[in-house]
């Protein structure tokens, strides 16, 4: 009876998550939100007739979207559910990985156990920021045959365990940059590092600390020329975006705050700076109060994709014809 009820519950959940298959085939989805245009230049990137579509709903907290060209699919994390889901135009939502972040056998319920940021490495393998296991992990199986078996990429800095790796980006050399705030920790006393870091992983597997001065480093991205690293700080008392100039070896030369949105946070504009994606134009699509802020490289706020939800992250497909957005319970898309 318990198994039967579990099957029913899971089936209902997946049905709630799905937009009807026939709707996906016709391209007709529920439209939500709006586009706030503060500078005319935003219309060069976001068409004037663009609308925000809800592709699927019913998630606990959607995060870490990643477009996989090989599968013509988007995968994304649901952190509280310790799962990764896959969305395609033809089949809508399917469970892709579970567990995705915490792989232990303890029955203790973890606050944020799942994976967060996702990325493909140079060998086209799935890399996961794993909150629950406090590591950067790599899925052992092929993308078209996913199995929840992982190997450790990195799990500590100078012998001290990471807090809970959050978001990740890769440069053309195959080096990773990632953030490590404390959101995945259930108890503060298990924290081993006395700071929240931004790190680089070299192709040889060396972990280099780049930044240790930010209260809540979260979203991360690289400029198209890979000379600038962008970091979003999800501290409601200091909700800011930073840019850092890097030398040829990928080390920080100098940094500055480019936009402070602390005063934008309100009941009408939910959310703090979280994940971000950098467009080929150099502009940032950075989640924050109200939805996804479009920000120029020098920090000018060009406009906002207003989602109506606290918004966690976003990513482009391979030709930047669509922006996929994870916003609380929703998976959304803006066609560009």
Label the predicted regions.
Residues 18-336:
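Sequence-structural signature of mature extracellular/luminal beta-sheet repeat domains
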Residues 14-16:
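C-terminal motif of bacterial Sec signal peptides marking the signal peptidase cleavage site
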Residues 2-8:
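Sec-dependent signal peptide recognition
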